[in-house]
Amino acid sequence: MEQRNENKTELKMIKMSDVQSQTVDWLWYPFIPYGKLTIIQGDPGDGKTTLILNIAARLSKGEGLDNDMKVTEPVNIIYQTAEDGLADTVKPRLELAEAVCERIMVIDETEKSLSMIDERLETAIKRTGARVLILDPIQAYLGGTMDMNRANEARDMTKRLSLLEEKYKCAILLIGHMNKAGGNKAAYRGMGSIDFLR
């Protein structure tokens, strides 16, 4: 008697003729799109956090990030950092950049650390209407059991984030550290699986 595989997934096919073409909506063309993941990575001390805080400050004021960027309106931003103190580092840097700090928010991790698959991310985006979510650095938000060197686990993490950004049309920026494998191309020096760089 043939046994049925209860876990078998039904095959579904999509014809490209049924797919409706869309244009990419850009936060900052051609660098940061809405509805997509963006990774900013570099060696320690390269100024990644300084760059991202200046981007956040300008967006909070509704300012363009370069001369060609259209200025529309100020946006709300969620900025999560695991490396810098909010009171002695992040806030002073934002004030120096003349940010509208009312528009830049942080999920409180006092009672429980945050991860990329934490349901609080979606709740925070819905509650604040944030158009930008920043996780600085990637490595701190993987969760205790995730191995970032395993391709399948990296894909699962980024897929969950992708669903969020597609659903809420926000931009998600991941800040990544480079490893010390000298001589390799930058894409392969990002710490963890190359699958973070989809």
Regions found by a protein language model. Name each.
Residues 51, 55:
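Hydrophobic positions on the alpha1 helix immediately C-terminal to the Walker A/P-loop
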Residues 39-40, 45, 49-50, 69, ...:
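Phosphate-binding/switch region of NTP-binding enzymes
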Residues 1-3:
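Interdomain "pre-motor" coupling segment immediately N-terminal to P-loop NTPase/helicase cores
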Residues 5-8, 14-16, 22-23, 27-29, ...:
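Conserved inter-motif catalytic segment of the P-loop NTP-binding fold
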Residues 60:
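Gly/Ala-rich phosphate-binding loop of Rossmann-like dinucleotide-binding domains
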